[in-house]
């Protein structure tokens, strides 16, 4: 979940967007398709536009400006860029079909995109193989954004997972659609009938939240969550990696994470990767929990060896994995911005951009491909003040205020290419990483798609 910045935090004119990490489809917007291990600046992208939100999906990226314009780039095989075609675009380009329809928020799933307009309407484009577009009788994919019917409710927050989506309305009702969680639920809850919202291909109300008012929602690979106006966190779906802070293998009904897990403080913001979560409380403390084997949690680990989730009734206790309960890495206290990729994270603390977690494609921005086990500053951005951060599954984006003196900018190389200068320079190295991504993803999801191409994007 990306926090809505206040008016005082609006991006100044002297700002620039930086991108790094996986780039097999041009999702960094740099005009080429080579992975980038250090942050690189997109020349003049933010001038004179001011950026409101940045985020990414499986192999694509999206930026929303203060004026409500949507810019997209990267993988477009299923039309997830909403440009009316299926050609990949390695540089940020405006989604012209949305001109005159200001966008408030955008959420990127693996191969689809959900948009929220300023008047509370939800749009979708991309793959619809699992009903993730919220249009039950629609085509297998949609290359232009189309409206989703949410029972005439005004929506205030959206989230996109691997193969499902979630929305919260102004009245605090939560809707879910897409069948991405259903196969996991059937496997872990044999003989049980799953609630409709797990199998619906159109928005279906999430039952079990009737006594709470959702302010925001989030979606992981096989789980969902909501944050209420009372500062409570509810979770449902798969608990394979302890991401639900519960002993059940699968939660078919939302359950609240008890307040003592957050030191009895109200939660004010929450974010989700594929299999881990990050939350911030009213005093600025940060809590992380869930999968930890790539450094996702940013804190010292208990042993992870030997833990295995067995098939069982969802209400029977399972062997709780290490780090399945929220715990606070003190170094993250006071973060003003946070974003989670599939297994890595970005945060801004005191104007400094920090990264940690999975780093196979260089998305932690330290110039290496070694996992980062504790939050550390992105050295290449130390001379700039971080304003916003956003993650795709395996790539990173940051909006930074540039120093007054250009000579102070570290690593000033700019590799942005105009459309006329684009060259497809994918190397064998990128192909090898795509193969590694596919092997790693098989651990995260037991259901595979033959046409998936793993590259390190969400």
UniProtKB/Swiss-Prot annotation:
The keyword Transport does not apply. Residues 426-442 have a biased composition (Basic and acidic residues). Pfam families: WD40_RLD. It comes from the Eukaryota. RCC1 repeats lie at residues 15-67, 68-119, 120-171, 172-230, 231-283, 284-351, 352-402. It comes from Homo sapiens. Residues 420-458 are annotated as: Disordered. This is Secretion-regulating guanine nucleotide exchange factor. The keyword RNA-binding does not apply. Probable guanine nucleotide exchange factor (GEF), which may be involved in the secretion process. InterPro entries: RCC1/BLIP-II (IPR009091), Reg_chr_condens (IPR000408), Signaling_Regulatory_Domain (IPR051625).
